[in-house]
Structure formats: C-alpha cells, structure tokens
Amino acid sequence: MANFMYESGAFEYATPEFIVESMSDAAPNDTYFSYQWNLKNVSYPGIDINYVNARNAFAFPYINDIIVAVVDNGVYNNHDDLHLYNVSYNAHTGGIPSGLYGDHGTKVAGVIGATANNGKGIAGVASGVKIMPISICYTDNELGIAASTTTNFANAIRFAANNGARVINNSWSFDTSSPISEINNAITYAHGKGCIVVFSSGNKGSAVSQPAAGAPSATLVVGAIDRNGYKSDFSGYGSSLDVVAPGREIWTTDVTGGYTCVSGTSFAAPHVSGIVALIWATDPDLSVWRVRNIIEQTTRKIGGNTYGVDPLRLNGLWNQFVGYGLVNAYAAVSAVSGPAPTAPNIGTSLSEVEPGDLSMMGLGYDKWNIAYLARGEGQATCSIENYDSSVTYVWSSTLPPYTGEGFTFTVDFASDTDEPVLHDIECRVLKNGLSTSSGVHLALIPQGYSY
C-alpha cells in the first residue's frame, strides 16, 4: 500500500508504520554476571544461550513448581545462591537425605538454578527451580567413574522420576564402548513418567561417551562450545550428539559457599536442563517429545560448521560436531506459546507384547511381528503397510543394534532372564517439514511366564 501511494505521485513520501515489540536488555544484578558470557556474550554477540531476552520477555509462572534432579556426587546444602528441594537421595546407601555435598554436583546445580537478580554471585539459567540432589558416589569427592556402580546410577534416575523431578541432569559418563541396559531401562522408565533426561557428551574429544551414546532416543545429549562459538576440543561428538551449549570458562557455585570458573561438558548439559525447566515453567503440560523437539528445532546454527540433512535427524539440519546447534532459551520458550505443529498422526495402543502378530493404528497399518525365545535370542520386525509415500518414517529403539530406516525397522535382541524385559520402540514421522513421534513400551515376555 505504501509503495502504491508513493508511486501515484500524490505524496512526497509514504512508508508503512510498523508495530515493533520492544524488548529490554536489562541484565540481572548478580555480582559476577558480567563474567557469564554463556548468558550474555558481549564480545561475540549471539554466542550465548539468549538468556537475557528470555528472562525479560517471559514470566515463567510455574518455575517454582519445577524440580530438576542433579545426579552427581551431591550438592552443598547451605549455599546462599541455591534453592534445594526438600528431598535428596543417596543412591549408594539408599539414604534419604543424601548426606553428601560434593563439589562437582554443586557446580552443576549452580549453572541450572542459581538465584538470579539477588545482588550476589551468579545467575542460573532457570532461577527459581528446585534442585533435587541425588548422589551416586561412595564419598563426596570429585565425581569419578570408579566411584559408583551402574546400579547406583540406575536407581538414582528412577528415584528422581518417582519423586517429582521433571528434568534429570547427568553430567557423568562411563569408560566403556557398549550401551548399558540397566541404565537405559531406568532412562526409559523416567521418560514414561514424563521426565526429560539430559546427558553430557563426555570430555575425551572423541565419540560421545556411554551411557549417553547408547541412551534411548528421547534423551538429550549435549556437547560444549567456547565463547568464540567453536566446539571445545574436549567435547564428545558424533551420531549421538543432539545440541551444544557453553562449556568452557563457566562461572558457577562451589562447595565452599563461594564461586568458581569451570570447563567441561559437565557444565554444558545443565544449560539444557535449565532451558527445559523454563519450557515446562511456561507450559507444564507439554509432552516429553514436544519439549525435546522444541530444544532441537530452536537452536542457533553457529558459524564454522557445515550442517546437512541426516535421515535420522528430523528436527532440521544437523552436524556431527555441534548437533543441531547452540541452544536458544528465548526461541525455545517463544515456541511454547506458538501453535503446536501439525504433523501426520501416528498413534499407538500397544503396551505389552505376547507371541504373535500385533498392530499399531495410525498412518496406514503398522504390523509388528514379534518372535523370541525364553532366555535366548529373537528378532522384532516393524513395518508399515499402505504407507504414504510423501511421509518419511524413521524407526529407533533401545534394542541394540540399530539397523535400517524408512518403512521397515528390524532389530535383534537377546534376553538372559526369566522376567519380562521392557524396551522402547519409536516411530518418528516427517511430512511438510513437520515431525511427530509415537512410541510403545515393548515388554518381551518369556514363554511360559506367569504373572
């Protein structure tokens, strides 16, 4: 209209009057906030998690209801800048409260939820959340993989899921190349309880460490970048990596009651845990899959990396060194208030499997042929009949190894127990740039088993 008016010759000038949403860039008054490039990067704008815009634009009405579990070596319980939940747990002894107040866990907790704008210390990503300390070590010494057992880690995740945690942060890894079924079963259980499980990618500078590398598909695996926007040299990478967050020179709380500067993917993961908390603090009814998709779909594509299409990655362009990119708190929370994506429907009603043919109703007809032996090996084949050729289907599973993609997914499994074994199998569907997911809890029931 403005162009038409100007070109008519009747007006000296014509310009549209734009409606602009103003946004404050006011930063919190915490003592060391100016050092927190991860929240506001003055030297390299855009290489941060866009915290200030998120903080100033949204109210987070449910923030005080969100519990974030820190599975670690304990959290110092008398730090002025931390708000701890009134339940903690020692997964090694089974004790409540934990009784361990480790330095590593205290540092992780500060990144997630240190109180913002209180005139002291630092600001956490999700100020106002309750931190649930869960210790998995024998002592509160610096966290080490030799200091616990896989059972302790699995019990820690289950405890968090059973006691109100919505987010479970795991800044630890194991020195093994094989998936750990005991921990994966606990993660699957937590997903079923409505929890997002976040893992650091590891600090070896090579492939993502276990158990993150072999974790169920709803897990978020986080690598680290520095203040220049480059992947940190120690950060784990590869096909299991989902996103990156700041992980070098991060200011946070420590076990002395003071503050310190740290580096590692251990401190990248809690940025994502904090943003997940902010999403649920805006809309606590969102599903695990919706929240995970929001995190991945709203990232910043930081420079120096070539992103491409991966048939197993349905939330946009992806890169093996930085995943979908740098997490973006403002964009993620903005996506909550927008309309939910409209994608192909796929629904399941399957919860338990007996020998024979089973079905999932949704796009066309999904037929599951299940065969297995008690205390032996078997094979599950998932296929879609009468499929829509304009739709991309991707199968994933907690059952190793992953094989195949598209319309048919086959996976081998083995069982050495007389008890039912629970697994997750998921079908992700992409059409017109939109994706949705549906999964089932697959219970492999040994022949002859009686309830």
Where do the protein language model's features map onto the residues?
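Substrate-binding/specificity loop regions of serine endopeptidase catalytic domains
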Residues: 23, 82, 95-101, 119-123, ...
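Inhibitory N-terminal propeptides of secreted protease zymogens
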Residues: 1-31, 59, 64, 186
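Surface-exposed, flexible coil segments in extracellular/virion-facing regions
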Residues: 397-413
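A short beta-strand segment in extracellular, disulfide-stabilized domains
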Residues: 374-385
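Active-site core segment of subtilase-fold serine proteases
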Residues: 11, 28-175, 220, 228, ...
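Hydrolase catalytic cores
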Residues: 109-112, 132-138, 166-170, 233, ...
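Solvent-exposed loop segments of extracellular immunoglobulin-like
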Residues: 387-393
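Exposed beta-strand face motif in extracellular beta-rich ectodomains
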Residues: 419-425
